[in-house]
Amino acid sequence: MNWPVRVLVVDDSAFSRRLVTDILQADPDIQVVGYARNGREALEKVASLQPRVVTLDQEMPVMDGLTTLTALMAGNPVAVIMLSSHTAAGAAVTIKALELGAVDFIPKPAPGDSLDDFTRQLTEKVKAAARVPVTRLCRGKNCRENTPAPFISPRPGREEAVAAVTGSAAATAAIGSRLSPGRSPGGKEGVAGAVSAGSTRGEAIRPGKGTPAAIKGAVAAGAGRLPGRRPGIEVVAIGTSTGGPAALRQVLTALPGNLPAGIVIVQHMPAGFTGPLARRLDELAALEVREAAAGDILRPGLALLAPAGRQMLLERHGDAVQVHLAAEAGITTLFKPSVDALFLTVAREYGPRSLGVILTGMGNDGLRGLRAIKEQGGTVIAQDEATSVVYGMPRAAVEAGLADLVLPLEDIAPAIVALVTGAG
């Protein structure tokens, strides 16, 4: 891409416009090409100035942030970073903005907050957003509706059959039977050995996109890389960062409410935003989704999202595995919550019964945890580059040779179901 990054600052507050402009202009890799005081001005200036990134306020006269974002994505897609408030209402609006196509967000500094932290985050996020290809930004009809075609209807009832994910019990059994020896959920003998030709250890499977046949074929081919006799998967651990809320929505809304495995999730977010994200995902998914609390017990059909500002760790007590929330994780990490911190305890408590999923995000958080999962005999799925908003965390896993499957986002939920239900 071309440097410096051209940025349009959109905010009705003169103070906020000046603060953001001064911070960005101090970086030689960033050029503020203009500002707008409301959404209508923003649409006009995006068309005339052609910025690469827009910083967008939520509450403005004439046209608010969400309305502006929707119009931008439908007509003139550009990387958008939302400047959000710390209020509960502001957090809910931010979650909606991420669904509608915003690349990332940053809370406006409150009195007493460190301007150094805000400066660092703002410049880092602007540069990261500038690297996102325009083809990955939400656009047109897909953005206005912004509802991925689910394999099941949103919240049809938490007893929805697992077979609905792939269309029929026979289809689910067919996928599962091709993953490992033994019996599939439908009682058929597995045939993994017959379909594993061409797969070598250390080489991730990369299927074609979009068709059930491609998904089934990829998962079946992946059996050649997986241990021949795996115990049933009991936990799905998901880690993500930039682009994660939209990715989580697509994955979780395509899973059945009675998935026979618990789910634990780390999404890098500041305090005050993980709760609203969990509530929004719970509204949309057939699974039960909630922000994790200390003492929560993992169970099938429940997805627990790590709270911001804490490390979510797992501890086994007898037959139950519980959530432990800690200030520190006993490892060196920049993040709270940390994907590595969670995944390391997943590997410890579940071993070969664990499935690690790494989605879009900056950096390499999760790499140590995925390595531990693999060393304990677990399985790893990584999102592919073409569908990742930022191909950092998945890339680290793929380049380290840890990914059993490298899949486009829309194929990850079917693969999870196939692996979980076909591993018995």
From Swiss-Prot:
Gene3D superfamilies: 3.40.50.2300, Methylesterase CheB, C-terminal domain (3.40.50.180). One of its GO terms (molecular function) is protein-glutamine glutaminase activity. Residues 6-123 form the Response regulatory domain. The modification 4-aspartylphosphate is found at residue 57. Keywords: Chemotaxis, Cytoplasm, Hydrolase, Phosphoprotein. It holds the Pfam family Response_reg. It is an enzyme of class 3 (hydrolase). Phosphorylated by CheA. Phosphorylation of the N-terminal regulatory domain activates the methylesterase activity. The keyword Cytoplasm applies. The keyword Phosphoprotein applies. InterPro entries: CheB-like, CheB_C, CheY-like_superfamily, Sig_transdc_resp-reg_Me-estase, Sig_transdc_resp-reg_receiver. The active site is at residues 241, 268, 365. GO terms for cellular component: cytoplasm. It comes from the Bacteria. SMART domains: REC (SM00448). Contains a C-terminal catalytic domain, and an N-terminal region which modulates catalytic activity. Belongs to the CheB family. Involved in chemotaxis. Part of a chemotaxis signal transduction system that modulates chemotaxis in response to various stimuli. Catalyzes the demethylation of specific methylglutamate residues introduced into the chemoreceptors (methyl-accepting chemotaxis proteins or MCP) by CheR. Also mediates the irreversible deamidation of specific glutamine residues to glutamic acid. PANTHER family: PROTEIN-GLUTAMATE METHYLESTERASE/PROTEIN-GLUTAMINE GLUTAMINASE, PROTEIN-GLUTAMATE METHYLESTERASE_PROTEIN-GLUTAMINE GLUTAMINASE 1. This is Protein-glutamate methylesterase/protein-glutamine glutaminase. It comes from Moorella thermoacetica (strain ATCC 39073 / JCM 9320). The gene is cheB.
